[in-house]
Amino acid sequence: MSQPSSDGQRQPAIVILDFGSQYSELIARRVRETEVFSVVIGYSTTADELRRMAPKGIILSGGPSSVYAEHAPVCDPAIWDLGIPVLGVCYGMQLMVQQLGGAVEAATGKAEYGKAPLEVDDPTDLLNNVENGSTMWMSHGDSVKALPEGFVRLAHTANTPEAAVANLERKFYGVQFHPEVVHSTCGMALIRNFVNHICGCEQDWTTNAFIDEAVALVREQVGQKRVLLALSGGVDSSTLAFLLKKAIGDQLTCMFIDQGFMRKGEPEFLMEFFDQKFNINVEYINARKRFIDKLKGITDPEDKRKIIGTEFIRVFEEESKRLGPFDYLAQGTLYPDVIESAGTNVDPKTGERVAVKIKSHHNVGGLPKDLRFKLVEPLRKLFKDEVRKVGRNLGLPEEIVRRHPFPGPGLAIRILGEVTDEKLNCLRDADLIVREEIRDAGLYHDIWQAFAVLLPVRSVGVMGDQRTYAWPIVLRCVSSEDGMTADWSRLPYDLMERISNRIVNEVKGVNRVVMDITSKPPGTIEWE
């Protein structure tokens, strides 16, 4: 079982050493789907540090380097003497082979990228329940030339003789493919075999267990002190509000700053939902005029973001002093933010760890240091999908738990060019129609994001035998798993027709609706 450490923090049962793979976080997510707690740490973590962490298993991630390159990242060789099962994935497998006495070479003419059928040679142990011929995702330009002593082949593909290998006695395993990606059809079976059967991990990473632990830790940290939370209405801050309410009750104060860029009816809904229905203390701050005045004449999207962020900080600072004093600031920092700030990424040219600037949480990342808050971040262990599960278990309604992502600057960056009250009213009405029609069609939860964009141009039209010169609205709908990549959603033609007809007929100032059919990449989901 993942036991708490001396500071009350849960210790990971599985640790992933990150060698710079784009899939390292995904490996951790897949392990957690087996109800086992896992974390991503830097590849340079020493064997002594790992011994103190006492994980049940270690996974070596993939990476962009070649193990024979001059500055290739390597793990502490003493790891192989810890007596802990190890699974190497892609680069991780090649590193295992090289450090234990085998050989790796460039796969000249035999590099594999994309899907490949896996031919299973030994269906026991790691490959139990992995079907022969099942599709696995390949992404490698190197291959194993010679196995270390004690290793055997478990599987192969047409171009990769050593697609899966193992030293069964020492419980060292390597796979040249990526079992963590959705394209690998039996990837989860392999991960379960390693985590649950080979490592013997208990399945104790459950939503209810997390809630109980988080509540206890918040109570211990905060005591009788007051906590302030900037509430946006998104799933992260909403889940955090419910968790803190459960932990410390009326010691929590939420501040909802209405900057005037939210969707139609949202401020009223949020105040009724949190303050009246669930008795969470929410201070409503109407700052609409301040924000719209600051954006007068501003057209550059980055300038808009900076101005909105700066003004948010000013309002937050003023109101926190008025409502305070507060000892703690609650933030919805999630685990991907923690990973980025820890700098587990790798520069393939130098082999050095690269620190990536942590993402600022919704609007509060640049709070002045003189506010002197201590931070409460009980969600910092969780991925986004885990936050949704926690919110659901705490009683958040589905309309918030499964709410489409919404940018911090709100509609201000969905209005291209200068933001005015007239444009905001126009876009709110159009955006509401988009969401209503997609919900009525039963497609809302099948789409990652669906919204309207107002362009800073006008087009000629004809309505009631009269010439019109009005704004066009862009319909933007995308499908995605995590927002990192996205494909434009193929909406039914009759649905697009209903949306277009309603917007043109019901929204004053609009005479044309167009569809954005750009995927990400090359485009981004938002226009600004």
UniProtKB/Swiss-Prot annotation:
Active site (record annotation): 90, 178, 180
GO MF entry, a single one: ATP binding
Alphabetized PROSITE patterns for the sequence: GATASE_TYPE_1, GMPS_ATP_PPASE
Domain GMPS ATP-PPase positions: 205-403
Catalytic activity field: XMP + L-glutamine + ATP + H2O = GMP + L-glutamate + AMP + diphosphate + 2 H(+)
Keywords per UniProt: ATP-binding, Glutamine amidotransferase, GMP biosynthesis, Ligase, Nucleotide-binding, Purine biosynthesis
Domain Glutamine amidotransferase type-1: 13-204
GO cellular component term of the entry, any: cytosol
Enzyme Commission number: 6.3.5.2
Physiological role: Catalyzes the synthesis of GMP from XMP.
UniProt cross-references to NCBIfam families, sorted A to Z: guaA_Cterm, guaA_Nterm, PRK00074.1
UniProt-recorded name of the protein: GMP synthase [glutamine-hydrolyzing]
